[in-house]
Amino acid sequence: MMPQSLPDTTTPKRRFRWPTGMPQLVALLLVLLVDSLVAPHFWQVVLQDGRLFGSPIDILNRAAPVALLAIGMTLVIATGGIDLSVGAVMAIAGATTAAMTVAGFSLPIVLLSALGTGILAGLWNGILVAILKIQPFVATLILMVAGRGVAQLITAGQIVTFNSPDLSWFGSGSLLFLPTPVIIAVLTLILFWLLTRKTALGMFIEAVGINIRAAKNAGVNTRIIVMLTYVLSGLCAAIAGIIVAADIRGADANNAGLWLELDAILAVVIGGGSLMGGRFNLLLSVVGALIIQGMNTGILLSGFPPEMNQVVKAVVVLCVLIVQSQRFISLIKGVRSRDKT
């Protein structure tokens, strides 16, 4: 009788996978570590006049507008689109805020009007993309160019300044020992997370980004979903515009939100979002915004000219896009398979 061989009971080795968000958190810690090496007192935080001050707090404060833009941009990119107009929408909202404040309107009317401009801008983009089927890049590029002109028309081509302590609180005040913009960004993140993860909206957005035709066949109103993402992106841009205008107590239509649309896109990409659409993570997009602001702060603290920011961001975008490319992924998979053999 031939001896029977015992069955192989060894379990296959599991491949190690980073926990969700770990690469982004490690990158953020590395950026902050480099900043601390450049500035010896980087981690020093003091409490003064009921508010925390220090470089880490300043990073949180300065990252708030980009984080707000990134929250809205995340939803748009998740549908496979892009919104290049968020910087211009910031300028429009800021110009509306300053002009109406100078005209003597009450604070609630000013805020509602500024938020309304963002919603209308997002609705305009949504109609062009979802209804008229214009490519998102081209559709939002129209408002990106025209929006600056609209903001200049609102301010009559002038830098409008105002003196309203109540409005200024939204840009330079404090709440719970933290700058007001940080609190606003956190509350917006929580609200959008609840909206997308505790309702079916998030699933619909991801379905549209993964396969819009399949989502439509499944009964999803893809036009409404796409339009809604652009409306929410415009709303986030308007909130950021109010914060910036309140911080400087004025509106500069030429420079408000200039090139911040690129920072918002970069924040989403750093957060793991794919420009092809699909799954998204709002929290990691905010972490991406913190990484960008951390790099900006490090460059300024190290004494390099501010123009270096754009070069560094371009290199980061290139590296992230290469890592996300199908060719690079296939190459890595091929190397792993050869190592196993």
Swiss-Prot record:
One record GO biological process: hexose import across plasma membrane
InterPro entries: ABC_transp_permease (IPR001851), YtfT (IPR053777)
A GO CC term attached to the entry: plasma membrane
Annotated membrane topology: Multi-pass membrane protein
Side Periplasmic, residues: 47-65, 108, 158-174, 245-255
Family: Belongs to the binding-protein-dependent transport system permease family. AraH/RbsC subfamily.
Subunit structure: The complex is composed of two ATP-binding proteins (YtfR), two transmembrane proteins (YtfT and YjfF) and a solute-binding protein (YtfQ).
Name this polypeptide is given: Galactofuranose transporter permease protein YtfT
Source organism per UniProt: Escherichia coli (strain K12)
Gene: ytfT
